[in-house]
Amino acid sequence: MTSPRVNLLDFDADQMAAYVAGLNEKPFRAKQLMQWIHQRGVSDINDMSDLAKSFRATLLDKVEVLSLPVIKDEHATDGTRKWLLDVGAGNAVESVFIPEDDRGTLCISSQAGCAVNCRFCSTGRQGFSRNLTSGEIIGQLWFAEHLLRNDPEAIRRIEKYPTPGWEHTGRVISNVVMMGMGEPLLNYDNVVSALRLMLDDRAYGLSRRRVTVSTSGVVPMIDRLAQDCPVALAVSLHAPNDALRDQLVPLNQKYPLRELLDACERYLPFAPRDFLTFEYCMLDGVNDSDIQAKELVRLLRNIKCKINLIPFNPFPESGLKRSSAQRVNAFAGILLDAGMVATVRKTRGDDIAAACGQLAGDVVDRTRVRERDIHSAEIEIAEVESDVQPNEQPIEWLKKLT
């Protein structure tokens, strides 16, 4: 019986070196393979011309360079591009490329589905299927980078607005954010293996400042990441107190805000920048009041951070609404007046459901949570009187979503 082929995308630099050594080849062959695969985007062993013919013959019988099959390739009017990728057994994940004037950002997935089940995120609606392998994670970058290098539209844009690395390496993707489907820190080993490849000069050579892991707050893994591979960290916060965050981000019930913020402060000395990012999805009448803005200031004022306010991207089953632009600006104004650094994220790719919180996979619904009668639920939000303490704000309406 023929042994299954080894997918070389599954190997980081150390694993590649060990594999090559196991074939009784010299160490420099591992570097050659890394460069052919990750820097040049070559998947056919026969095209790796500076490898010895005997080595190529050995590899042809044992290995492959296999990225995920593409189910759908969608283009948004703003230049954003989304790929639906097949990970087998009826599962799919999504990757999104976001072109900007000074960078090209790829948003990648770490899991098929997500178990965290944040109330405002469509990915959580489908439940959790499995972790992606390191090859499936890095394969999203491999596929997108080398496809875009040969895409006339992408080349025209990048020649007009060069991204970091373009002139010297021909690299289209300058930034990677792990903000796609899944909770990266619940797939820790595979994510870290993929991160190391992104940073490795023999592969993609990205700066730690340009690679971001977004987490909803897996406290023990934040501490491990600080030691193992400290890239930029973004924390999905979305609420200024435990009572509300318990409802919006159920993981908060296991790792409440005080534990999460303590972990963030421990991470800061290892971070590639001198600040962390906190993401805050703006939900109409839920977490966007002046009182909650002031509470957020009190919560974060002693942490070096940037607060990224994200307009909610609606999907039918959520029962939630996006805060108005006026409310977002007023909320941001309170943060800025208090001396906080705050930005409002520009929504991209709405027309192809590629915006933040919209990635759900165009696949068979495998939701493992109770059926929710969301469509008919009327959200009743009690008026918050001026003498009500922030941590006493009513959250009964959220129980209709569970």
UniProtKB/Swiss-Prot annotation:
Disulphide bridges: 107-356
Gene3D superfamilies: 1.10.150.530, Aldolase class I
Domain Radical SAM core: start-end pairs: 100-351
Catalytic activity: adenosine(2503) in 23S rRNA + 2 reduced [2Fe-2S]-[ferredoxin] + 2 S-adenosyl-L-methionine = 2-methyladenosine(2503) in 23S rRNA + 5'-deoxyadenosine + L-methionine + 2 oxidized [2Fe-2S]-[ferredoxin] + S-adenosyl-L-homocysteine; adenosine(37) in tRNA + 2 reduced [2Fe-2S]-[ferredoxin] + 2 S-adenosyl-L-methionine = 2-methyladenosine(37) in tRNA + 5'-deoxyadenosine + L-methionine + 2 oxidized [2Fe-2S]-[ferredoxin] + S-adenosyl-L-homocysteine
PROSITE patterns assigned to the protein according to its UniProt record, in alphabetical order: RADICAL_SAM
Root EC class: transferase
Known function: Specifically methylates position 2 of adenine 2503 in 23S rRNA and position 2 of adenine 37 in tRNAs. m2A2503 modification seems to play a crucial role in the proofreading step occurring at the peptidyl transferase center and thus would serve to optimize ribosomal fidelity.
Name of the protein: Dual-specificity RNA methyltransferase RlmN
Molecular function GO labels: 4 iron, 4 sulfur cluster binding; metal ion binding; rRNA (adenine(2503)-C2-)-methyltransferase activity; rRNA binding; tRNA (adenine(37)-C2)-methyltransferase activity; tRNA binding
Record-listed E.C. numbers: 2.1.1.192
Pfam families cross-referenced by the UniProt entry: Radical_SAM, RlmN_N
Co-factor binding comment: Binds 1 [4Fe-4S] cluster. The cluster is coordinated with 3 cysteines and an exchangeable S-adenosyl-L-methionine.
Residues annotated for S-adenosyl-L-methionine binding in this entry: 182-183, 214, 236-238, 313
Annotated binding of [4Fe-4S] cluster, by residue: 114, 118, 121
Cofactor: [4Fe-4S] cluster
SUPFAM superfamilies: Radical SAM enzymes
Keywords: 4Fe-4S, Cytoplasm, Disulfide bond, Iron, Iron-sulfur, Metal-binding, Methyltransferase, rRNA processing, S-adenosyl-L-methionine, Transferase, tRNA processing
Organism: Polynucleobacter asymbioticus (strain DSM 18221 / CIP 109841 / QLW-P1DMWA-1) (Polynucleobacter necessarius subsp. asymbioticus)
Family under the similarity heading: Belongs to the radical SAM superfamily. RlmN family.
A Gene Ontology term for the protein's cellular component: cytoplasm
Subcellular location: Cytoplasm
Something else known: Reaction proceeds by a ping-pong mechanism involving intermediate methylation of a conserved cysteine residue.
Protein's GO biological process: rRNA base methylation; tRNA methylation
Residues annotated as the enzyme's active site: 94, 356
